[in-house]
């Protein structure tokens, strides 16, 4: 029985890129990156979050505890890349352990996923309905989730992605629900505003989970961060729009190199 965090490193580059997956899936969501140009530019670190994939024997943790656990594995001067819920985790790591982090990339994520006064997001009623209907049919839930969020994506690539994800150990319903609770209650809008680490935010113009209005608001709230929206992309742009996605990641790495950043003391 494996009760350790599953962590795998690949790539020929010298810059550490930590890939943090989102809700319901595992590190296989990034499988397409292994064959990409990112492999030459970065040392890619794939992690299965507590309760997911080959870390499924670990109980789900709070956002703080997850950040603490991952920080033990993260090399100094790393770039964090968090997708969806993984963006919350990446942000929390950067807030709690800035001395290790060179930059943050948030992909189709939000500091606050749920709608609030003067803030767009997922309506509470819709979120709670999904939470209450979550059942043991994990295959169907994840398959439908990926399909709905994969507009303009090659059918065979999506089929292969589903197979890769579902080939790994499944999370429990308890894990799925505890992570949904974390998404529901987390609001990092004010805290991230104070973060001094360079940040890139990537959005998809057709993303139904993270409304495009969020980019416009955060461009004002967080003027020191960079942002791009990939046209015609939904919630999984690293699969549907690989060229644009890879270019944005490499350009951000090159930008960080011009700053000659060494991590905060």
From Swiss-Prot:
Quaternary data: Monomer.
Disulphide bonds in the chain: none
Official protein name in the record: Pimeloyl-[acyl-carrier protein] methyl ester esterase
A biological-process GO annotation: biotin biosynthetic process
Family, as annotated: Belongs to the AB hydrolase superfamily. Carboxylesterase BioH family.
Domain of life: Bacteria
Statement: the UniProt record of this protein carries the keyword Hydrolase: yes
Enzyme Commission number: 3.1.1.85
Molecular function in Gene Ontology: pimelyl-[acyl-carrier protein] methyl ester esterase activity
InterPro entries for the chain: AB_hydrolase_1, AB_hydrolase_fold, BioH, Carboxylesterase_BioH
Stated role: The physiological role of BioH is to remove the methyl group introduced by BioC when the pimeloyl moiety is complete. It allows to synthesize pimeloyl-ACP via the fatty acid synthetic pathway through the hydrolysis of the ester bonds of pimeloyl-ACP esters.
Cell location: Cytoplasm
Residues noted as binding substrate in the record, renumbered to the chain: 23, 84-85, 145-149, 235
Keyword Cytoplasm: yes
HAMAP family for the chain: Carboxylester (MF_01260)
NCBIfam families linked to this entry: bioH
Keywords, in A-Z order: Biotin biosynthesis, Cytoplasm, Hydrolase, Serine esterase
Cellular component, GO, one term: cytoplasm
Active site per database record: 84, 207, 235
Recorded name of the encoding gene: bioH
